[in-house]
Amino acid sequence: MNQAIVNIDPKAPAPDPAWMILSDEGVTVTLSIASELNGVKQDKIHLRSPCVREVRACQAAHPNDEQAVDAMLFASLAGVSEKDVLNLKVKDYNRVHKSYFRLVEEDDL
């Protein structure tokens, strides 16, 4: 019997899912269901990497509503309306949410 021995490093980051394409400049998320973004049905949404000023502006606009902060920020980073973000299916909104946090987190810490 020939079995491969797999050495899994528990500190290694999990691989990105197939629906997420990550770079230093942003993240592209493949939607499970095409959604209307800026009046056009699309199956992908791209979020560019944010700057601190943008995050703070969204937090100032919605100081007591974390979900509204996220929706405003995701819309700004994707260049779409908040309505477009809020009309995503929950599964796709969760993909965008996870992808955003994967984009802004530091891997090596």
Question: Where do the language-model regions lie?
Answer:
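Short, surface-exposed, charged amphipathic helix/loop patches that serve as local interaction elements
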Residues: 2-109
